[in-house]
Amino acid sequence: MASPTRPGPYMPRPPAVPEWLNTGDNGWQLAAATFVGLQSMPGLVVLYGSIVKKKWAVNSAFMALYAYASTLIVWVLVGFRMAFGDRLLPFWGKAGAALTEGFLVARASVPATAHYGKDGALESPRTEPFYPEASMVLFQFELAAITLVLLAGSLLGRMNIKAWMAFTPLWLLFSYTVCAFSLWGGGFLYQWGVIDYSGGYVIHLSSGIAGFTAAYWVGPRLKSDRERFSPNNILLMIAGGGLLWLGWAGFNGGAPYAPNITASIAVLNTNVSAAASLLTWTCLDVIFFGKPSVIGAVQGMMTGLVCITPGAGLVHTWAAILMGICGGSLPWFSMMILHKRSALLQKVDDTLAVFHTHAVAGLLGGFLTGLFALPDLTAVHTHIPGARGAFYGGGIAQVGKQIAGALFVVVWNVVATTVILLGVGLVVPLRMPDEQLKIGDDAAHGEEAYALWGDGERFDVTRHEGARGGAWGAAVVDEAMDHRLAGMGARGVTIQL
């Protein structure tokens, strides 16, 4: 009797399920990538659009949305292999496309992660997960994209959108890929034993330092915006923050490239640290300001998530609580106390305080990972002999490596971001013109987030051709003009385009 024909998804030729493919691993990696994607879109898109002043809601959300889309195209064209391909330089991989079937359906591999001893003998093989390269490309894209989206938080409310469109692909290629290859792709920091489990340095320290540097070159918002920049929708801000928190399960849970024991520990530690940090930040707000702040709670949640990221799957859960407490207190101090006493921090207009929530928290997390990383779990993750926390035999050497790795990331991002922005500035202005800065979304995009307004911002219906068409549109325009002629302005007129 002939054996039954297997259904299409499991056809033997070509092998839809090769011997090396673990369907569980592949399913988890795709799910983790989706979780991280939801952090950016809609998570940070919603958070940015709601945490800013109403007149910048559309522009802020669009900056995040554009960064996400542009990153994907550049990533599959050249970026992925610059970060995770064959070694070109000690800090950079060879550029190449990730577009063809032959590459994408082959087993995932990070070739430069093979580690050799001083005698040239292979001590640990390259990283080779049990799923196709396409899954690796997708997951790493999501991490690259969220880095640029986080960076955008420093520049909201004044950067020329055309300059942002030019900046994002350049920064991805000449800054992000360097740090990613150096720490994750088998570059010199990886081989040296610097620990960055899921992006405390590659993503958060990079975005915080690059964002702060970019904010310096772009310049500050208008004085009126800096003095009064209250969120336009705190409830939506909480919703965006919630997506960010829950999506972090994929962020840190997908870092081992397998649903193994470190993935489970990472997801638990991530949530524990976030909760501890949120509570710590809230308590400090109550102690020093007499009342809890919802915005502060979201910032505390963020710093806890960032602080645990460099060591999420490598530390005890009690250490995750300590890291959460540190993540909720030291960035609070830098933002609330140090910021007011530093001339440089006062001068640079970092719109969403990305420097404090990501650079400070990421640096802190990397340092604490150098103290608390467990030998057994670190060996599972990095394959670099001797990589472990100072409290578990790593000594001061591991802490020194963590500090040196952070210094490299800081210096590279300052230099690369500066050079890129100065180059972009030769072609297109980095800042919006004064008229757009005063008006906001309507001048920058011809769109506004809400049909209702009442805080002094004005919707000029006569600028929109779509509102003039037909009898209904003409009536709306006439009504708006009547209000203006009566000296009442446009307030109270609801426009629906």
Curated annotation (Swiss-Prot):
GO annotation, biological process: ammonium transmembrane transport
Residues that span the membrane, as ranges: 32-52, 60-80, 136-156, 170-190, 199-219, 234-254, 270-290, 294-314, 318-338, 352-372, 408-428
A Pfam family this chain is assigned to: Ammonium_transp
A single Gene Ontology CC term: plasma membrane
UniProt-annotated location(s): Membrane
Membrane topology: Multi-pass membrane protein
Alphabetized PROSITE patterns for the sequence: AMMONIUM_TRANSP (PS01219)
InterPro entries, A to Z: Ammonium/urea_transptr (IPR029020), Ammonium_transpt (IPR001905), Ammonium_transpt_CS (IPR018047), NH4_transpt_AmtB-like_dom (IPR024041), RhesusRHD (IPR002229)
Ribonucleoprotein found in the keyword field: no
Highest taxon of the lineage: Eukaryota
Keyword terms: Ammonia transport, Membrane, Transmembrane, Transmembrane helix, Transport
Main subcellular location of this protein, as a coarse class: membrane
GO molecular function: ammonium channel activity
Record PANTHER family: AMMONIUM TRANSPORTER 2 MEMBER 3 (PTHR43029:SF27), AMMONIUM TRANSPORTER MEP2 (PTHR43029)
Family of this protein: Belongs to the ammonia transporter channel (TC 1.A.11.2) family.
Task performed by this protein: Involved in ammonium transport.
Protein's name in the database: Ammonium transporter 2 member 3
Organism this protein belongs to: Oryza sativa subsp. japonica
